[in-house]
Every structure is written in structure tokens, then in C-alpha cells.
């Protein structure tokens, strides 16, 4: 067997073999896609899903036949492309124009106060300096012996 110092290492691996740990990007398993070194798993799976989606949409007779119309960045139909959709005031033309008259104002005020308390509670947990006070609504009550144990219970 040749030694490494002689410069000729005999191995069963090919010269072009790249170990999986040294390959760039995550390479998962897509059963229908052939394994190549040049493309990542994300690009391969996106291309696979986009090809499947295009064939389904092109073969369907109605736009709602195989699951409806899905917005995407690549499509054969220009109406489905996300960049083609309206971004101005036209997007509100097809929104429902109804209002609720049975609003419970007391309940909505209670929900607003709870939302404010939840935000203060989040600020308390995010605070590293200890200057934000704890919100009393979210303090879980404990029994007195857990807080102040008797001397004979400590042992």
C-alpha cells in the first residue's frame, strides 16, 4: 500500500467525489429528481413543484379544477403572477363592503385592555435591565406554603 508521504494514496473514491459534509447547501431527498452537484435542494424542489403546478394548471379545464388559482412568481398565466397583481387602490374593489352593527363595545374595550397588558408583559420579559414592571394580570397565584415555607417544612 502506498503511503501519503509518497504522494500516491490508493483509495476507492473517485477524484471528482465530494463528501456530503463538504457540499454547499442542504441536499434533501426528492425521489423524482436526479442527484447533481450543481443545484441545491431548494432550487430542485421549487423547480419540481413549479413544473407539477404548471402541468396541472395547463391540463385543467376550469381554473378551480385542481385546487384553484395560486399566486406565484413563475406562471404561464399572467393573472396569477404576483408582480402582475394590482398594488394600488384597485385591490379594495373586490373586498366585501359590509359592517357589523352588533359590536359589543364593552367586550372590545376589554380585549383592547388585555392586548395592552399582553404587550406590557412581553416588554417585561424582553427587558434585560429590570426596569419594566411585571404586569399583575399575568402573575400566577401560588399557595402560601410554597412562597413562605414553615421552618419544619424546609428540612
Swiss-Prot record:
InterPro entries: CIMIP2C, CMI2A-C-like_dom. It comes from the Eukaryota. Keywords: Cell projection, Cytoplasm, Cytoskeleton. The keyword Cytoplasm applies. GO terms for cellular component: axonemal microtubule. Disulfide bonds: none annotated. It is found in: Cytoplasm, Cytoskeleton, Cilium axoneme. Belongs to the CIMIP2 family. Microtubule inner protein (MIP) part of the dynein-decorated doublet microtubules (DMTs) in cilia axoneme, which is required for motile cilia beating. This is Ciliary microtubule inner protein 2C. It comes from Xenopus laevis. The gene is cimip2ca.
